[in-house]
Design a protein with these regions (language model features):
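Active-site helix of classical SDR
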Residues: 124, 160, 168
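Alpha-helical segment proximal to the catalytic Tyr-Lys
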Residues: 129, 173-177, 234
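Short, small/polar-rich loop/turn modules that mediate ligand/substrate recognition or access, typified
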Residues: 176, 181, 217, 236-238, ...
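Conserved glycine-rich cofactor-binding loop
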Residues: 18-20
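Conserved glycine-rich Rossmann-like NAD(P)H-binding loop of the short-chain dehydrogenase/reductase
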Residues: 32-49
Length: 250
């Protein structure tokens, strides 16, 4: 599993792939030759993925609620049967329910932990068996700088992402003997529609925290994921790769 021709035989599942970082990851993997299945929470989102990847053979968008364990397992089973295996899982789907802790409702906490932590566990658990059977796999989860440094108003999000980082290390120890690597990529501040709409003073305050002096792009995260999915990262497991322009140095 050492070159693009081999990657063309591999299948990658990317959750939350209809926009932003997820869309960039799906595109980067497709460009590397993977057959990419991207998920979205609506039929419209799934169709957007299919169109974005239409130039690449074997790629498609699928409608999936990652909180539906039965649906997730059914999709993974269908992928392995259709393509003969599943080689890369990228856990990217996530939500936010930001507010200060004193105002945070239980449902805000529960919703974020359910999608950003529990669903990552479920998806990862569901791919373990087929990956063990083929004695090869890459599980890559998108964490966050917030999970390492914290951020006011994001106690739920920080807890979930820190939990994913810990789970990544535990799974890496469990699965390493089966040639399955498990890693995380922790984005810092990335260019989005939201950051673009911030007032100038807020943008300057944001940039002042970043030694490189600019926001990251979704493609920066996608390239990190593509590396961890590749044969070049065969000896990398249990790691959280921070891609944040230096705003947090672990």
């Amino acid at each position: 599993m050492s070159d693009t021709s081999t990657q063309a035989q591999q299948v990658a599942l990317v959750t939350g792939a209809s926009r932003g970082i997820g869309a960039a990851i799906a595109l980067a993997l497709a460009q590397q030759g993977y057959k990419v299945i991207g998920t979205a929470t609506t039929d419209e989102g799934a169709e957007r993925i299919s169109k974005a990847l239409s130039a690449f053979t074997g790629c498609a968008g699928k409608n999936l609620n990652v909180n539906d364990a039965a649906a997730a397992e059914a999709l993974i089973d269908a992928i392995t049967k259709e393509h003969g295996g599943l080689h890369v899982l990228v856990n990217n789907a996530g939500i936010t329910r930001d507010t200060l802790a004193m105002r945070m409702k239980d449902e805000d906490w529960d919703a974020v932990l359910e999608t950003n932590l529990k669903a990552v566990f479920r998806m990862s658990r569901a791919v373990i068996r087929p990956m063990m059977k083929q004695r090869y796999g890459r599980i890559i989860s998108i964490t966050s700088v917030v999970g390492a440094s914290g951020n006011a108003g994001q106690a739920n999000y920080a807890a979930a992402k820190a939990g994913v980082a810990g789970m990544t290390r535990a799974l890496a120890r469990e699965l390493g003997s089966r040639n399955i690597t498990v890693n995380g990529v922790a984005p810092g501040f990335i260019e989005t529609d939201m950051t673009a709409s911030l007032p100038e003073d807020q943008q300057k305050a944001l940039l002042s925290q970043i030694p490189l002096g600019h926001l990251g792009k979704p493609s920066d995260i996608a390239h990190a994921v593509a590396y961890l999915a590749s044969a070049n990262a065969a000896y990398v497991t249990g790691q959280e790769l921070h891609v944040n322009g230096g705003m947090h140095m672990a």
